[in-house]
């Protein structure tokens, strides 16, 4: 049985960017599975809340995010997926977020991204990082099994619809999303896949996605979806935007990206969106945390050939 004192110790340990021992991860994930099992495909979220986009294993930048947005549980958070892959510290990043979820289940909402998948993590880094840090794939297996239970979308006060990717031609209403069976690996196609893979586009209607999964959707689609479901806004992540946030479709859609200097080379700002009482929306932008080497010195930006 995981108790608060134990969780607080784990969180303190993880905040130093140190992985938890495998047996602790196993205990944590068992408890987290119970928590996520009780959440819905469209998980209700109360305001005020701070909405965050992709993190991608950039642990020190996530710590910077908490400095700017406030610590959990003082601030209520909603994360829209992609905690792992690409960055150097996927293990510590996802373990900390899941620990916070188990410790403060009402103060942090963690949605599934397209990288919270067995197939994608075997290609983009999380699997290899688990092998490197634990000497086996057990922790990767524990987390990828847990990812199947993450809610697909969040709904802030019935007005702001939050998800990782975008809309689906197979889904007109939130009720249709509520009926999906989400407890599975991210499919290659279909409505659940689209929610995690699709992107807004300048072209109207539905389009074939250059990503090879999901669709592109135009302003006509997002406007219809918002009107039909009495929504004010679709908030999503999934795409690098240089300022950290980007409005599209005449403010029917906003993209939020929370990994600054993405992949340690893109030079972008990161942002979080604060939804206050009265549905006022404000953005906080931030730059990367200083990166420290093994001796504690601050490194220059890593040249491309080390990536």
UniProtKB/Swiss-Prot annotation:
Enzyme class: hydrolase
The protein's Enzyme Commission number: 3.1.3.16
PROSITE patterns: SER_THR_PHOSPHATASE
Cofactor binding notes: Binds 2 manganese ions per subunit.
Residue span of region Disordered: 286-307
Cofactor(s) it depends on: Mn(2+)
Catalysed reactions, semicolon-separated: O-phospho-L-seryl-[protein] + H2O = L-seryl-[protein] + phosphate; O-phospho-L-threonyl-[protein] + H2O = L-threonyl-[protein] + phosphate
GO MF terms, alphabetically ordered: metal ion binding; protein serine/threonine phosphatase activity
Active site: 115 (proton donor)
Binding residues annotated for Mn(2+) 1, in chain numbering: 54, 56, 82
Basic and acidic residues bias locations: 289-307
Annotated protein name in UniProt: Serine/threonine-protein phosphatase PP2A-1 catalytic subunit
């Amino acid at each position: 049985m995981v108790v608060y004192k134990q969780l607080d110790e784990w969180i303190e340990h993880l905040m130093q960017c140190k992985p938890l021992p495998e047996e602790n991860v196993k205990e944590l994930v068992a408890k987290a599975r119970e928590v996520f099992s009780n959440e819905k495909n469209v998980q209700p979220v109360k305001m005020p809340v701070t909405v965050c986009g992709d993190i991608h294993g950039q642990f020190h930048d996530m710590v910077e995010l908490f400095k700017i947005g406030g610590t959990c549980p003082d601030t209520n958070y909603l994360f829209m997926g992609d905690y792992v892959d690409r960055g150097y510290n996927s293990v510590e990043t996802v373990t900390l977020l899941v620990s916070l979820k188990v410790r403060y289940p009402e103060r942090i909402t963690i949605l599934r991204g397209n990288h919270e998948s067995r197939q994608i993590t075997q290609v983009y880094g999380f699997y290899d990082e688990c092998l490197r840090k634990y000497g086996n794939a057990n922790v990767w297996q524990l987390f990828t099994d847990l990812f199947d239970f993450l809610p697909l979308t969040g709904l802030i006060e019935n007005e702001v619809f939050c998800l990782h990717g975008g809309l689906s031609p197979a889904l007109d209403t939130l009720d249709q999303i509520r009926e999906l069976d989400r407890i599975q690996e991210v499919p290659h196609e279909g409505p659940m896949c689209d929610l995690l893979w699709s992107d807004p586009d300048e072209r109207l209607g539905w389009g074939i996605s250059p990503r090879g999964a999901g669709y592109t959707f135009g302003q006509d689609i997002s406007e219809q979806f918002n009107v039909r479901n009495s929504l004010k806004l679709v908030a999503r992540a999934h795409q690098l935007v240089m300022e950290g946030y980007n409005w599209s479709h005449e403010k029917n859609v906003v993209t939020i990206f929370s990994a600054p200097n993405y992949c340690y080379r893109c030079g972008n700002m990161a942002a979080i969106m604060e939804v206050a009482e009265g549905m006022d929306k404000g953005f906080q932008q931030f730059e990367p945390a200083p990166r420290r080497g093994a001796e504690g010195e601050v490194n220059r930006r890593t040249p491309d050939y080390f990536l």
